[in-house]
Regions:
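Short, contiguous strand/loop micro-motifs
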Residues: 23-24, 43, 79-80, 102-103
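Short, acidic/small-residue loops that bind anionic groups at enzyme active sites
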Residues: 39-59, 70-79
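Class I S-adenosyl-L-methionine
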Residues: 1-50
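Proline/glycine-rich low-complexity loops and linkers
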Residues: 37, 66-70, 85
Length: 202
């Protein structure tokens, strides 16, 4: 519980020990750290939050994927299905799906039939590329590619019931546009572009 965690941290501080509260991934995502920081401040205990590597970054590596492909998506939505922790109505899966951006969905592996339904109702085509990444960056990591409509059956066939991320979007397909960043006609701070668009910038 929060109280038990705080008891250990406060006790360590009183004993002048170096206390590390270790989280998986990056604590800024679904880490419940705000309440811990508030209680530390109440006790006048200083702290430092160190960044980690979120599983959604690990999943991109496992997929050899770029979440922001030119001409496909320049945005990434990180969200979850409502469970024991509610999700505000304005942040529904359907409302995010309407943007057709890349979506990375946490904490929803046990609700994949409902997730597929909501993604499709929101605007994704049933055939939209998707992936289930189980235990990203772990030794027993597993990557299962599928379509949005097949999320539930794919998870069942591979024995995945928890500890997985769902990635959805056309960035998992094969189409994209060449980036401007490395285009010969594109000017940056370090390189003058060649051609009529040489003065262009992102």
């Amino acid at each position: 519980t929060l109280e038990e965690v705080m008891e250990v941290m406060i006790s360590g501080e009183k004993q002048e020990k170096k206390v590390v509260r270790l989280h998986t991934g990056d604590p800024c995502l679904y880490g419940a750290i705000k309440e811990q920081m508030d209680l530390l401040e109440k006790e006048n205990i200083s702290y430092k939050v160190c960044p980690g590597v979120s599983s959604f970054c690990g999943a991109a590596s496992a997929l050899n994927a770029e979440y922001t492909l030119p001409g496909i998506s320049q945005s990434v939505v990180i969200t979850r299905m409502a469970g024991r922790t509610p999700v505000p109505e304005k942040e529904s899966i359907e409302s995010f799906a309407a943007h057709q951006a890349t979506m990375v969905i946490f904490l929803s592996t046990g609700m994949l039939e409902e997730l597929s339904k909501r993604l499709i109702e929101g605007g994704y085509q049933p055939e939209t590329p998707a992936a289930i990444v189980y235990k990203a960056t772990w030794e027993d990591e597993k990557v299962c590619r599928c379509k949005v409509k097949d999320l539930a059956v794919t998870a069942k066939e591979n024995g995945i019931t928890k500890t997985a991320l769902i990635v959805v979007g056309e960035v998992l397909g094969g189409e994209y546009e060449r980036s401007l960043l490395y285009h010969p006609e594109f000017t940056t701070e370090f390189r003058q572009g060649k051609g009529k668009e040489g003065a262009g910038n992102v």
